[in-house]
Amino acid sequence: MFYTHVLMSKRGPLAKIWLAAHWEKKLTKAHVFECNLEITIQKIISPKVKIALRTSGHLLLGVVRIYNRKAKYLLADCSEAFLKMKMTFRPGLVDLPKENFEAAYNTITLPEEFHDFEIYNINEIDISEPLAQNQSRPEEITLREEYSNDLLFQAGSFGDEPEILRRHSFFDDNILMNSSGLVVEHSSGSFAEEKSLFFDNGDGFGDEGAAGEMIDNLLQDESTFLEEAYLNKEVSLPPELPSSIMVEPGNSDDQCIPEDEEINEITLLSNEDEGFTLDPIDDLDIADRRRRKKRRLLVDPVKEISSKAMHRQLASFMDTLMVLDLAPPTQRLMMWKKRGGVDMLLSTATQDLINDELKMLFTKCFLSSDYKLAKLTLKESVRKEVGNQQIAEPSVMGEPNSHSELDQPQDWKDVTDESVGSFQENVNMNVNSEQDILGMISPAVEGLSSMNGSLAQENCPAELESSGSKQNTEAEKWNQRLFQTLNVLREFNKMGMQSFSLKKLCRNSDRKQAAAKFYTLLILKKHRAIELSQSVPYADIIATVGPMFYKM
């Protein structure tokens, strides 16, 4: 009943009315202004399709809401226009009193205030200094006009045939007879006379006389130079001269001038300070610049990827097996990773020590001095007792029945006898119970085991050199440890102990020492020197005396 094309279509005539009735927030200002209420009401009154009474009521609600919106917009526009007019025409402030219809000049004129800008004084600015820095001298930017010595003979005859000197009637006999007469007396008057001879052809511009004066001005200070230049100047005589003309023999040197000699063209400056020397131009650089770089066509030898290469790349899984070594996300984790290695864990401090001296002190003070001193004294005492004697222990790997008793080395016997003797003296004074005996035995056993371990480490290189075999060295080391443990157990048995606890024997020992003691007990069990028993798994192991306890 409510769904019709007239109402629901966006372009329908009643769509905006239906939207205003049911969804007023969706209605925009443009929709309100575009809606014509008169036409809309006519369509509601006489619709093309029959509309239900309830639908028409909804449409009337939409018409009322749109009309309300239009009234609000009109009221807002009128209020805004009224406010603007009220602000524009203010009678209390603008209207003048009846007594004075003319406003004062100051009230209607803005004051002309010229502020003093912070500018430099023009008189104090020195313009010559920056201009002088960027200004070049005329001699540096002007090409020099070099006047050669040929100007005297070629300037006036520019464009004429070079037949002036070839005319037979040009030179007088006196001139030809004396070749030095052309240059000996050079003055302004002589140049004027020669000018009248050589520059007889005028060009009609009226400057025929200016050429000589210009040359006189240029050459007025260089008369000596001109004399030397003209002495070296070759004067070509006409080939048609008669052979009857004679030349004075005294002036033969002046006449014999080589033809290959070139004129020394040098321009002298009036002020020597103005001259400067140009650097020579390298011809190779100019040639390299002019060379054009040849373009070569580069073509890839492989223009396409083969199917085998593509299959090989797809089947390759090596990139998935690579170990990704990514940097830590933070700087602190990076420092921890760098200093957390084994090489730096026990040699550097946890905090950053910038000073190198502090780092050296930390490494020196890492081990206690008491531990170092005790280790050194122990080594010295062992070296004195052992000396240079070689240690030779019989093998334990043979049958137990074939050995009545295995002999110990004399040096090890001395060490064990001294330690056990001191131990017996302490035990005989305070023997009351088995617990007291075990409490006093454990420190002696620990000291003995540590001493034996250090002795074995000290004598290891000597044994290696004497035996020459690694297997023999290991066997001798285990033989020493085996007999040391067996002698200690024998001493305990003589004091009245029938059973030995592995837990008490391994007290204050690290894992390596405890494993060595346990392995020694297993070897003694194999040779039937002791018997091992354990009540429950992971319980303490008890060792008792075996049949071969005193026969090994």
UniProtKB/Swiss-Prot annotation:
GO cellular component: chromosome; condensed nuclear chromosome; lateral element; meiotic cohesin complex; nucleus
Phenotype when the gene is knocked out: Male mice are sterile due to defects in chromosome synapsis at prophase I, leading to an arrest at a zygotene-like stage leading to total azoospermia. Females are fertile but develop an age-dependent sterility.
Gene3D superfamilies recorded: Structural maintenance of chromosome 1. Chain E (1.10.10.580)
InterPro entries: NXP1_M-like (IPR049589), Rad21/Rec8-like (IPR039781), Rad21/Rec8_C_eu (IPR006909), Rad21_Rec8_N (IPR006910), ScpA-like_C (IPR023093), WH_DNA-bd_sf (IPR036390)
Keywords, ordered alphabetically: Chromosome, Chromosome partition, Meiosis, Nucleus
Main location as per UniProt: nucleus
Compartments where found: Nucleus; Chromosome
Stretches the record annotates as Disordered: 389-409
GO biological process, one term: fertilization
Tissues expressing this chain: Specifically expressed in male and female gonads (at protein level).
Function: Meiosis-specific component of some cohesin complex required during the initial steps of prophase I in male meiosis. Probably required during early meiosis in males for separation of sister chromatids and homologous chromosomes. Replaces RAD21 in premeiotic S phase (during early stages of prophase I), while RAD21 reappears in later stages of prophase I. Involved in synaptonemal complex assembly, synapsis initiation and crossover recombination between homologous chromosomes during prophase I. Not required for meiosis in females in young mice, while it is required later as mice age.
Family the entry assigns: Belongs to the rad21 family.
This protein's name: Double-strand-break repair protein rad21-like protein 1
Biological source species: Mus musculus
Gene that this polypeptide is encoded by: Rad21l1
